[in-house]
Amino acid sequence: MKRRTAREKALQTLFQIDVSNIDPKEAITHALDEQESDPFFEELVFGVLEQKDKLDDMISQHLVNWKLDRIANVDRAILRLSVYEMVYQEDIPVSVSMNEAIELAKLFGDDKAPKFVNGVLSNIKNDLKQQ
């Protein structure tokens, strides 16, 4: 499975878990739709779920005039996925994670999603550089 496909499937899985609160393994089965799983895909899904509180704190610190629970579910899932990559996937350049997130926002979000996602991630990127 290509990494872009793994990210798309991970996003679909995380979105489904977030909105319907189903078991992660069931959400994975739905997202894979009889495709074979992939270690990168599973690492993204389970990594985001394990670090969700930390990721949400990081994202919340960079939301201007928004609360995390008020942003679109798909945007929230994209941000969690990308911030997880930016912080925990050291083999992936931050710029690649950001570009992939923007592409996911174009594909799955509304017209304003790419700009919103880019803005939040840019602020997080700047914070990560300072650490």
From Swiss-Prot:
The entry's keywords: RNA-binding, Transcription, Transcription antitermination, Transcription regulation
A GO-annotated cellular component: cytosol
GO biological process, any: transcription antitermination
Disulphide-bonded residues: none
Pfam families in the record: NusB (PF01029)
Single GO molecular function: RNA binding
Domain of life: Bacteria
Stated role: Involved in transcription antitermination. Required for transcription of ribosomal RNA (rRNA) genes. Binds specifically to the boxA antiterminator sequence of the ribosomal RNA (rrn) operons.
Family indicated by similarity: Belongs to the NusB family.
NCBIfam families hit by this protein: nusB
Descriptive protein name: Transcription antitermination protein NusB
